[in-house]
Amino acid sequence: GTHYFIARKQLNDLRKFTIPSIHEVLNLWGLPADAWRYNGQDNYFEMYNGSKIFLLDCKYLPSDPQYQRFGSMQMTRGWIEEGGEFEFDSYSNLKISIGRWKNKEYNLKGKLLITANPSKNFLYKEFYQPYKAGTLERWKAFIQALPYDNKMLPKAYIENLERTLRGAEKQRLLHGLWEYDDDPTALCDYDKILAIFENDQIPTDKETYLTADIARFGSDLCVIGVWRGWELIEIHSLDISAMTEVQGLIHTL
């Protein structure tokens, strides 16, 4: 059988909210009770054909800060539920675990489904921004789905959302707005903060410059930067140092 996973930051949330939905779907499909079983000790569903659906607890562990425990798994496909709760490293390691269990045997492409409300974690940069700009890679897909699109939701639930939610939360959860915290009075635009780590918008400049914060014998470091236009390409620092040492370093740059 094939191997699938359903991942969430807290396993308890999967038990409380996702397992009842799985039972509902199995019943809608008309599968008899003996066609599957749930192993509550190891947290997986096993189907009549041997395929398994593992429920994964993806909370942060100080002993595994980069979530490497997921990278060694062998999965056919997977699903990240509430992707807005996930860090990039957990998403990345879950992603590399798919396509490794009987995909070739059953001619199945490795696929990862992520469901989430609008958030400003890796989803914003990896999916929403490229989708909006028309640059999303062909092997990825972004599907914007609003509560109004779900025909299974009771009308009273939608009405309750409309009455209860306010401000940014209403824009985010009801109308699917990803730029929900863009404030025109904010000191820095959120997209500009993200761009700090890439600076793709800065034109290439052939002129180079040097800046130096000379600390000498103070408690601060002496910091020297080499710039190509507005791009900082080198950083050098010195502990307590004489002017001759600083001059010597500058002459080598």
Give the location of each predicted region.
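ATPase catalytic-site recognition across NTP-hydrolyzing enzymes
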Residues: 150-212, 226
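Conserved RecA-like ASCE P-loop NTPase motor core of nucleic-acid helicases/translocases
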Residues: 2-14
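Inter-Walker segment of RecA-like/P-loop motor cores
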Residues: 15-76
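Nucleic-acid-processing active sites and adjacent nucleic-acid-binding tracks
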Residues: 225-253
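Short, flexible loop/turn motifs enriched in small residues
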Residues: 205, 216-223
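Walker B catalytic acidic pair
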Residues: 81-82
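ASCE P-loop NTPase helicase motor core
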Residues: 85-156, 160, 164
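Residues immediately C-terminal
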Residues: 13, 85, 217
